Amino acid sequence: MNYNNKKTLKDIDVKNKTVLVRVDFNVPIQNGVITDDNRIIAAFPTINYLLENDAKIVLFSHLSRIKSKEDKLKKSLAPVAKRLEELLNKQVKFINQTRGQELEKAISSLQSKEIILVENTRFEDVLDDQVVKYESKNNSELGKYWASLGEVFVNDAFGTAHRAHASNVGIASNIKVSAIGFLVEKELKMLFQAVNEPKKPFIAILGGAKVSDKIGVIENLLPKVDKLLIGGGMSYTFLKALGKTIGKSLLEEDKIDLAKHYLEIGKDKIVVPVDTACAKEFADVSPTIFEGNIPDEWDGLDAGPKTIELFKQEIKKAKTIVWNGPVGVFEFKNFENGTKSVCQAIAEQTQNGAFTLIGGGDSASAAINMGFKDKFSWISTGGGASLEFMEGKELLGISAIQDK
């Protein structure tokens, strides 16, 4: 999909306008403390542009999932407002409501260059202890109500770009002027370049737990790539399809035939592990390496040294690299070697001029936690959204934005 025709922030007038901005502040919080503020910082180009251009800014974001009254007590955006204030060095008025007089009054008295952060949009998923999902099912009245609070809507939340929620599609469909923010614009540009206009050789590295999560990506990318490297939990279903024994490694029994089909149509392209780092239990213990077959009682938890070498050789040839999903249980120190080595090899190839993109989710957090934050061309902020883009699917949150 190409979204080049969508209005961007620079196409619209924001001076003295009340601008509703959907950001993605869905950050990890432990005991009231934000442990990773990358998503907050990612929204700064848009927020700073709006401040410089005299906008009145109203920020909307979700935080986690809300399924009960108890969740609401634990998942307020209050700590995010505090952190945002510290990072911007500017007052952020937090309104602990998602609708009502207090919110309306605060917005109507907002001055240029002032910022309001509205409470977690997903609080609208539970009302009076009833699960109603007004936000996540895009309740039409809620979308209209939020849209009525502003004059302009900017969607800068790539993390929910594939969802039709009241706070993105709902507002965009009910407001006169809408545009995408700088983060979303950059995400779309980078993904389009990687998936639709790749310099050859083009390789994709797919990992993560399940084949079923990556079917759409495999089907969209297999005709385009020169090589498809398969690692992580999903690789054991492919190894089983090749007739290997996989011990008690992760297996999707009902996807073996599909894996066989992919191996047949992509026989010159698909690269699977040749050895595996295993353990007898799912624990951070010293690994045992098996080549070829994995014996009974053993669980494959990472790529083995020969597989890592094989992957590195392919990465060294590439001019475009897309990576989605870790190649091992990187949360265990003893089984992080595959994912870390892939990170290192991609980082080196980026320095050699390759265009490299890491899909969001686990591979992005692995890369960032391992110290590779600035070593790739782009690390996506949206796991599900980048995956759906790679599948060639429409991103509903972007489609709802006005064309130029």
Swiss-Prot record:
Q: Where in the cell is it found?
A: Cytoplasm
Source domain of life: Bacteria
Keywords for the protein's UniProt record, in alphabetical order:
ATP-binding, Cytoplasm, Glycolysis, Kinase, Nucleotide-binding, Transferase
PROSITE patterns noted in UniProt:
PGLYCERATE_KINASE (PS00111)
The entry's ATP-binding residues are 214, 300, 331, 360-363
The molecular function terms in GO held by this entry are: ADP binding; ATP binding; phosphoglycerate kinase activity
Q: What pathway is it annotated to?
A: Carbohydrate degradation; glycolysis; pyruvate from D-glyceraldehyde 3-phosphate: step 2/5
Which cysteines share a disulfide bond? Answer: none
Where does the UniProt entry say this protein principally localizes? cytoplasm
- Please report a single Pfam family linked to this protein: PGK
SUPFAM superfamilies this protein is in? Phosphoglycerate kinase
Provide the E.C. number(s) assigned to this enzyme.
Answer: 2.7.2.3
Give the GO cellular component terms, alphabetically. Answer: cytosol
Query: Which top EC class is named for this enzyme in its record?
Result: transferase
Entry's Gene Ontology BP terms: gluconeogenesis; glycolytic process
Q: Which reaction does it catalyse?
A: (2R)-3-phosphoglycerate + ATP = (2R)-3-phospho-glyceroyl phosphate + ADP
Binding locations of substrate: 24-26, 39, 62-65, 122, 163
Among PANTHER family, the record links this protein to: PHOSPHOGLYCERATE KINASE (PTHR11406), PHOSPHOGLYCERATE KINASE 1, CHLOROPLASTIC-RELATED (PTHR11406:SF23)
Q: How does it assemble?
A: Monomer.
Q: Which family does it belong to?
A: Belongs to the phosphoglycerate kinase family.
Spell out the protein name for this chain.
Phosphoglycerate kinase
